[in-house]
Amino acid sequence: VFCHEFSHVRGLPDLYSTNYSGAFTPGTWSLMDQGSYNSASRTPPLHTAYERYCFGWLEPTELKDPCNVTMRPISDIGFYDDAYIIKTSNPYEYYILENRQKAGWDKYLKGHGLLVWHINFVPDMWNMNLCNVSKQHIDVIEADNKKDYYTVEGDAFPGTANVTALTDDTTPGMDPWTGEKLHAPITGIKEIDGIITFMFKGGANIFGEIVANPATDIKAGGFTANWNAVNMATGYLLSV
């Protein structure tokens, strides 16, 4: 409880429904919600990546270009600031990605994996401590698409439902309040030994591009084709 209340002193709002509307909120994932009661209030969870972003403790890496991402758990020493952000056309609305595992202060979480937060910052809601009432302004995208406190283990990706993608077209999907299509798909989500990997916008081309060089030994019956070697390639298919 002290950690929760002191976090208010540092500026964080409550994430539970403060008007008791019954709205489904982040629950045990956050110290500012039911997480303050984890392990009979003895082991509150780590501050989320969004909460640490608010404190100025981390600056999440923005995902813009196609890439392959590897994420260590935030509970690992030295990786407390391993987080990513996907922005929308509204500077106050974005998505925060973090890897949560049942270790350290996160030992009593109900689930583990890639947790995706949908943030829509509205100053008046923050000032009135009404962030998560009728609409969720600090929300977890439930991978299994179930808003149920009995299925929290399915909230993270891939989770119990083995959900490996989050795109404009999946359910649940990237669904910003702006109504736009983000064209920022997260695919191939995997969790192996607590490490999360995924591809953003299809992933990076790890092999590189083939660069053709001028042909040599040009004769009536043929020529020698030339190109720069491609890293890790074991063969090439040439169409003439």
Regions found by a protein language model. Give the residues of each.
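Pro/Thr/Ser/Gly-rich low-complexity, intrinsically disordered linker/stalk tracts
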Residues: 204-232
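Extracellular hydrolytic enzyme modules, especially secreted metalloproteases
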Residues: 1-109, 119-122
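A broad, structure-centric signal for solvent-exposed, well-ordered loop/edge residues
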Residues: 39, 104, 123, 219-225, ...
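Extracellular low-complexity, Gly/Ser/Thr-rich intrinsically disordered linkers
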Residues: 76-204
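Extracellular low-complexity, O-glycosylation-prone stalks/linkers
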Residues: 232-240
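A detector of low-complexity, intrinsically disordered, Ser/Thr/Gly/Pro/Ala-rich segments
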Residues: 23, 39-41, 46, 149, ...
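Hydrophobic beta-strand residues in large extracellular and virion-surface proteins
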Residues: 69-71, 86, 116, 140, ...
